[in-house]
Amino acid sequence: MKENETLKQIVLKTLEESVNSLISSFPEVEKEAFKIKIEYSRDEKFGDYSTSFALENSKLLKRNPIQVSKELVEILQKRTDLFEKVDFTPPGFVNFRISTSFLLNYIETSVLSGNYFPKVDLPLKINLEFVSANPTGPLNIVSARAAANGDTMASLLKAIGHNVDKEFYINDYGNQVFLLGVSTLVRIRELKGEEGTQQETTDDTPIEIILEKNILPAEGYRGEYIKDIASSLLKDPKKNVTIENLLKQKKYKELAELCAVWTIENNLIWQRKDLDAFGVEFDCYFSERTLHEADKVLSVMKDLEKSGKIFQEDGKKVFRSTEYGDDKDRVVVRDDGRPTYLLADIAYHKDKIERGYDKIYDIWGPDHHGYISRLSGAVQSLGYKKENFKVIISQQVNLLESGQKVKMSKRAGSFQTMSDLIGFLGKHGKDVGRYFFVMRSLDAPLDFDLDLAKDESDKNPVFYLQYAHARICSIFKEVGDQTSKEAAAILEMSEERKRLLFWIARFPEEIFDSANAMEPHRVTNYLQSFAKAFTSFYLAKDNRLKDASKEVRLGLARICLAAKNVLAEGLKLIGVSAPERMEKEN
């Protein structure tokens, strides 16, 4: 057994060897054409793993699946060191039950030795960009979901040996940023006693009139946080002097641009505070503005033109994105020479490529599916392989309270922020928030049940796991922390004990598979099933350590220690604490 193998890999390798042995007597069969795979048994009564090899390859084998399965069982049964039982279930399934001794040995070399996870043969340098929220306001709930999942993905990828840089892209350039500055300026002038139209009725009012009459743009920002920022700017002596001078000179556009910079700086400070409170730390904050200042946005056009993917149309420069699955070709430079947002995005990803990343992963918000093909095409036109760039869509979050959806709206100022959510959930906000956001696949909408999230009983899936960990800690406090692998090896194995051993041994492969698939929700699914197996073990009378003989107690304690390690390490990977003692909030 290699140290760098999961239990599933060991079983699969054994199956492959057995299949090769079986078909060596079938000279007419091509070995390379076979599909050989295993999966977890759908019903634990049949075994730990199963394979439908004979059914899936019946046409290639040109033999009865039942007969092939029986012959395969005969070969596999010789591996008594690995399998306790191998049997056949019609119409062609082979079931495996791992031997207790093998499970114990495997657990000793993995979960109990600190070598939790196998490492990839070729570690990659990976750029993982997520959250990247507009710096126009506080982080919202969708950003919180991306933060929890992106951070967990990074932890999983690092756990199996990859080098990962977590990156936040700051969209601090463009018209929306200018409108943010105008919105702040409107509030500043209001605080100084100026009167003006509170809201533009149409979206075609010239900017000069908007600024002159102190009109809040239709696409501006109306949240209370804008008023707070305006107030804080006026309280800053240096900024207040600048504001006074520019107002007197009626240099409203210049002041609006300055207000945009100040507002973004303020918002970024609060966004980072929210992320810190959520346990998310980025390796790099990358400003879009720096790309424009370094002339990297327009200069990337040369690369695109060299690729032959640009054509002229009505004075515009257009990227042939339809060649990559887009529904129409996309303008990258307007007829007045200004770049579109797409060109800035292309320049940003060129910068990532130049930084030497083997893989580039982006997590985007809902409703961005259509953008994938055009950016992926641009990345390919720059010479980067399609398979090395991947976009993951983080779908919408629905907050539910008493079974009803809670509305969210950023510009109207009535949205729920990441900070609101953490505060609402109390002292457990970080743990509960991160766990709930990771519970479902990112590509599916998430219903976030606020009532369940506030529940501090074991009905709450987070507390269910934390209570399990705390129970084990209390066991060790009661009977001491001494354990014995020799005592564990001679324990009589009840169904609860054997089931728990298998779930412990599954931990490395569950993490390895979750990391490779970039699906953090697999970890929470596994941990819930694991905790159920531990609870069944814990409640069984013959597993009460304080009532057991010394030898049995030491053996059971060894199993409990492994279970504790799984819970602690599993929760750590998703950014959730594993307390030794549970205390309810008053």
UniProtKB/Swiss-Prot annotation:
Record field: catalytic activity: tRNA(Arg) + L-arginine + ATP = L-arginyl-tRNA(Arg) + AMP + diphosphate
InterPro entries listed in its UniProt record: Arg-tRNA-ligase, Arg-tRNA-synth_N, Arg-tRNA-synth_N_sf, ArgRS_core, DALR_anticod-bd, Rossmann-like_a/b/a_fold, tRNAsynth_Ia_anticodon-bd
SMART domains: Arg_tRNA_synt_N (SM01016), DALR_1 (SM00836)
Subcellular location: Cytoplasm
Family: Belongs to the class-I aminoacyl-tRNA synthetase family.
Protein's name in the database: Arginine--tRNA ligase
The keyword Cytoplasm appears for this protein: yes
Enzyme class: ligase
GO molecular-function terms, A-Z: arginine-tRNA ligase activity; ATP binding
Cellular component aspect of the GO annotation: cytoplasm
GO BP terms in the entry: arginyl-tRNA aminoacylation
Record keywords, A-Z: Aminoacyl-tRNA synthetase, ATP-binding, Cytoplasm, Ligase, Nucleotide-binding, Protein biosynthesis
Transmembrane segments annotated in the record for this chain: none
EC code(s) of this entry: 6.1.1.19
The organism of origin for this protein: Leptospira interrogans serogroup Icterohaemorrhagiae serovar copenhageni (strain Fiocruz L1-130)
Main location: cytoplasm
Subunit structure of this chain's protein: Monomer.
